[in-house]
Regions:
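A short, polar/charged loop/turn motif at coil->beta-strand junctions and beta-hairpin connectors
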Residues: 52-54, 69
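Short amphipathic
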Residues: 59-63
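Rieske [2Fe-2S] iron-sulfur-binding domain
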Residues: 65-166
Length: 167
């Protein structure tokens, strides 16, 4: 059956005639030129950011880069930074590289550690993104943030050894 699909008549039916061309001549689909402003125009960059980059799966790295619990990679894209970290159960989780307290960047480069510590106010986050300690925990008038606050998570998945995330 598979051989027929790729080598026989069924293949012709699958790829011979695209179903939607919006009335365009297929010979003219790539005829328009791309203007230089696509590469340096802020308005175009903003449109790409709002309508594409925040809605697609992005490659963060390879699974072999973070094999042990606590291993993590940092992926920066324009104004965002994401941490992908190997969990103790072997799964992967991703978080914005930004403290849940005041937004300070947590880590600068790929490494391995048991937790993430904010360099600004010293909040500590577990590998699962939960706040696990803060200085002077009893001094918070609204109550301790430990166990209540966490890093903002991004969706992570893998395919064939590649690590992907989406915002």
């Amino acid at each position: 059956m598979i051989k027929e699909i790729f080598l026989g008549e069924k293949m012709d039916k699958i790829v011979k005639h695209p179903s939607v061309l919006d009335g365009k001549n297929p010979n003219e689909l790539r005829g328009d030129s791309i203007t230089n402003d696509r590469y340096f125009c802020k308005d175009f960059m903003d449109k790409e950011w709002n309508h594409m980059w925040t809605k697609v799966w992005l490659i963060a790295g390879r699974e072999v880069q973070i094999e042990e619990p606590g291993d993590y990679i940092v992926h920066d894209l324009v104004k965002e930074s994401v941490i992908i970290v190997r969990q103790k159960d072997g799964s992967l989780r991703g978080f914005y590289n930004s403290c849940a307290h005041r937004g300070q960047r947590l880590v600068e480069c790929d490494s391995s550690q048991d937790s993430f510590r904010c360099p600004y106010h010293d909040w500590q986050f577990g590998l699962n993104g939960d706040v696990i300690s803060v200085p002077d925990e009893d001094d918070y008038p609204q109550g301790s943030p430990v166990g209540k606050r966490k890093l903002v998570e991004v969706r992570v998945d893998t395919w064939d050894g590649f690590i992907f995330y989406t915002m």
